[in-house]
Amino acid sequence: MTQHKSSMVYIPTTKEAKRRNGKSEGILNTIEEVVEKLYWTYYIHLPFYLMASFDSFFLHVFFLTIFSLSFFGILKYCFL
């Protein structure tokens, strides 16, 4: 029997590479992880499993507003 060589090549993500190299510590990384967990918890899972559609709508509007204002703030900071 011959074994077939897999054509799939694993490439680690940037986050995995930073953890492996020991560069994942720091306040910015901690904030990034908290925001990512908050996003996945409240923006992705809750609207589909636990919330009524009216509550889900307002949660979506809240996160989109925060994102839009953050994006505007970054652009204003960079260009003005």
Curated annotation (Swiss-Prot):
It is a single-pass membrane protein. GO terms for cellular component: endoplasmic reticulum; endoplasmic reticulum membrane; serine palmitoyltransferase complex. Its main location: endoplasmic reticulum. It is found in: Endoplasmic reticulum membrane. Disruption phenotype: Lowers the level of total sphingolipids and increases the phosphorylation of YPK1 in the ORM1 and ORM2 double knockout background mutant. It comes from the Eukaryota. Interacts with the serine palmitoyltransferase complex LCB1-LCB2. Component of the SPOTS complex, at least composed of LCB1/2 (LCB1 and/or LCB2), ORM1/2 (ORM1 and/or ORM2), SAC1 and TSC3. This is Serine palmitoyltransferase-regulating protein TSC3. It comes from Saccharomyces cerevisiae (strain ATCC 204508 / S288c) (Baker's yeast). The gene is TSC3.
